[in-house]
């Protein structure tokens, strides 16, 4: 426990809140090659690798992921949600924050239905999260 004299000399410091998605917090100005600390909810990037990964201990699956180089120069791992995808090596994608609990190092999700990523086919429920269009009513 600190004494009052010690606290007067050097007060307690606030804990710094660390971001869970740091790649979304930086913008790169290519004209003067400087980064600015401005948060953006989504970032555009180009896939450099697309593959599958096995999850942590109690779970078992082949989860789809992509390594994406963002417009600010960061290279991150992103999860591809939904069944089936059309992403290849040079596909342009949109990323949002949000980790996948059982995949180590994956802190971002790819937004389905934007840019080069198509929505999930034949999706009926929670369509907006997977970029699926409203199905035509049967007449």
From Swiss-Prot:
One of its GO terms (biological process) is translation. Residues 119-139 are annotated as: Disordered. Keywords: Ribonucleoprotein, Ribosomal protein, RNA-binding, rRNA-binding, tRNA-binding. The keyword tRNA-binding applies. SUPFAM superfamilies: Nucleic acid-binding proteins. One of its GO terms (molecular function) is rRNA binding. Pfam families: Ribosom_S12_S23. One of its GO terms (cellular component) is small ribosomal subunit. It comes from the Bacteria. Belongs to the universal ribosomal protein uS12 family. With S4 and S5 plays an important role in translational accuracy. Interacts with and stabilizes bases of the 16S rRNA that are involved in tRNA selection in the A site and with the mRNA backbone. Located at the interface of the 30S and 50S subunits, it traverses the body of the 30S subunit contacting proteins on the other side and probably holding the rRNA structure together. The combined cluster of proteins S8, S12 and S17 appears to hold together the shoulder and platform of the 30S subunit. HAMAP family: Ribosomal_uS12_B. Part of the 30S ribosomal subunit. Contacts proteins S8 and S17. May interact with IF1 in the 30S initiation complex. This is Small ribosomal subunit protein uS12. The gene is rpsL.
């Amino acid at each position: 426990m600190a004494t009052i004299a010690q606290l007067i000399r050097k007060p307690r410091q606030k804990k710094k809140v660390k971001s869970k998605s740091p790649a979304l917090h930086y913008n790169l100005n290519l004209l003067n090659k400087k980064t600015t600390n401005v948060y953006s909810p989504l970032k555009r990037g180009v896939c450099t690798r697309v593959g599958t990964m096995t999850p942590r201990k109690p779970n078992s699956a082949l989860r789809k992921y992509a390594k994406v180089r963002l417009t600010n120069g960061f290279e991150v791992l992103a999860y591809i949600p939904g069944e089936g995808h059309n992403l290849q090596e040079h596909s342009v994608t949109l990323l949002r924050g949000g980790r996948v609990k059982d995949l180590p190092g994956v802190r971002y999700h790819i937004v389905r239905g934007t840019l080069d990523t198509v929505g999930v086919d034949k999706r009926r429920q929670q369509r907006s999260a997977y970029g699926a269009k409203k199905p035509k009513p049967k007449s």
